[in-house]
Each structure stands twice: as structure tokens, then as C-alpha cells.
């Protein structure tokens, strides 16, 4: 049961196809997403409809190209459509010109499908870091009102350890301004720990996640929860890739194990989370704050 007057948190879903991204990562092969992403997303939509919860869907544009009807369905059910880029290439591996072109293309595609402005962006693998901070200028110049790519932790592949923990308005190096909605972390013994998203949500006992989110709300900030449709897949996530080296095969085994762990209980855990905490989309949070978009 949600307490009256509880802090409203932000529910975000990254719409991407697991097998497509694994192929890209391990072989460099660019292929179309599988139809599994449609069924997995529909299961998420049903869970949210049952509890009257709306979210922000960060849609990878190559999923939208293949399944535009899925994007329309999400939009028609009252959820926010935001951009997850086009190719799922990490930003710090791109040049600014390449990033701008891809970002503009993805934004235009999603707006053409829904007929509504796309306000938000999330980078592949949270790849807005100190190395790619310039991307915030590009996003602001391309008409985005907010970003949700910064993980305020010291991670191996991502993270900005000195970033603010709460949503904040960033003034970029070129004098532009854009809202940042960092992924959720809590401070414990001078360390920042990620909570409430993806593998962190699946691998952490639910009771600890609940305590962490309660602590975040007690500090007056909303939690930014993120999940992926493939985490709700009924079948095991696995893929056979030929011509991998032994090292690559071992890495793939580790990836598969991490992405499969905790999935069987995830749907029940997700519904419990939605029942115990208040959630809304980033767009609606900004509207409630009175920000003109």
C-alpha cells in the first residue's frame, strides 16, 4: 500500500532486443530486432495497466523502425516515448558529428511515429561520462528537455562519481541548459551503491531495494527505476554465436548468466514495487514541477 503523500518516483523502460545487442557486441553484426521484444513489452504494458501506472519508454530507434506499431501502442496507452538513440553505440565511442546525426535521426523517427514531441534521451549503457560530457550540449541543441544517462557512481564502464544524486538542471560548457535525471544510487559508508534498476534490481533482495528506495524518498528525491523488456522474457535468454574465441565465449556465458539471474521472480517483484511506491513518467514529473516543456 502506497502511503498518502508519498514521493512520486520515475519509472523508465529501455526498449531494446537482447539478442540483437549481443550479436552487435560480440560479432559487430547489425541485424533487426526479434519479435520477442513485442511480447515482452506487452507484458510490461499489461502490468502497468493493471496498476494504473505510466512510465517513460526510452525506445531504441532500430526497434521503432521494425515495430512502429509497438511504439504507437505504448504512446496510445498514455506512456511517454523518449529516445534511446539509434544503434546502441556508446557515446564515448562516437564523434560529436556522428552522435548529433544519429540522435537527430532517432528523434525525428519517433516523433513521426507518434505525432508527439520527444523530450527525453537515455544513452546506450549510460555512456554520458566525463569523457562524453559534450553530449549534453548536443542534446540541448537538438531540442531535448532532459537526459537520463548519468549514473552517479564510480563504475567500470560508466559512471560520473561526483555527479549530483537528485534531478538537477545542468548548465553545459557551451552555456546551454538541460535537465538531468541520474539513475538512482545511495550513499553508504562514503560509497555510492546503485539500486533499483536492471541487474541491480534483480540481484538485490527485494527488502534491501525497498529500504534503499525509502531512504531515497526520505531525502526528498525521486528514485529513477529502469528495466528492460527482455528481463521479463518467459524463455531463457541464450544465443549461439559462431566463430567466437575462447575468451569471448566465456564472456558470453557470464553475460547470459547475469541477464538470466532473478528473472523468474521479476514480474512478481515488479508488480510489488508498483504497488508499494508511487510512479510516473519523467514528462509528468516535470509537468507537476511546473516546468514548461
Regions found by a protein language model. Name each.
Residues 41-45, 68-72, 100-107, 136, ...:
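Generic structural signal for well-ordered alpha-helices
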Residues 2-77:
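Active-site beta->alpha N-cap acidic-glycine motif
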